[in-house]
């Protein structure tokens, strides 16, 4: 086997984690002490926003009235597809059931949505409108009754109007002008008159991700997210221009967004390495600055001898987004095991999934695709078991449970069976 790195990144997604953790821990302690006032102070400090936190119904109606129809149509287009996909997931997800395990002993499970979901919608460098669709729509379809949304406000404006419109359209019950760690803390602790969130979902920067990590346990979370990632598997049949722009398309997210190419074609690799900087140079300032740093520090081009080598290294990376642009699409589709979301063929691209094609864009990063998938209706639903039984069935179950408990040395456990056997007229 011969795997050769034509470009190797000098940094990893975990770079600077220690500093981030220290900053986030201090912010969380500050909010725990100062509560809502602490959130407001941090909103003023980081976002330069000094207005109301809760977006009023009047404000939402004003935004709905003022937002241009084309934007509303596009949001509705995305919402419809994400809703349909979530409904299909729900229909094919586990079912409530009850089964008789032995004479008189019944057991089953119920699928029960969480009561309150907190959805974080980033709006720092970019206004991530689609994140509102992905999180709120999926929670709504899952049956969550109370959906909170927090999004970073702009000075004298509040949350981005299209994000407010989108969150409201998709079913948010409360929208807050609050971003960053303070938003995560507010939803977790039930501040500003809201119920505490049972689960937090949505992407965010490293500080948001670290806040979710620290608070996990007190509140459920969708996943431990890091900077967004893309990997592309391509062979000599791939279009170098499309491969290059797809890598750049994800690199523009931020300075630490990995972009990886796995290929068996040296010719394709050389063309992509040459073309990526040219495409980056053509971008506006903010995405150009982000993409330049991301490609320089986190971009990789890996040359392999065989398709099997490519599949193996891809599964080792377990990328968040994985595109396959090869002649042998079905082989890769069946062979690949570790990724957040798979984009099969040149016709589709990460941006489609990110924005409006229907699959969810809240996905595992930093190799977490080895053990989990992305956000789906099941993240908002608890699978809870139950049992019931007749008095007659206690004769066998009670006696067996008592004996097993005594084997383990747990006498009080055993006596909970003994007392029932005695009450119902059975000997042990």
Task: Report the location of each language-model feature.
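Short loop-to-beta-strand entry elements in the cores of soluble alpha/beta enzymes
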Residues: 203, 223-234, 250-273, 291-302, ...
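Short acidic-hydrophobic, aromatic-tinged amphipathic segments that line or gate anion-handling sites
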Residues: 2-8, 174-179, 301-306
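Conserved small-residue-rich beta-alpha loop and adjacent elements
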Residues: 99-165
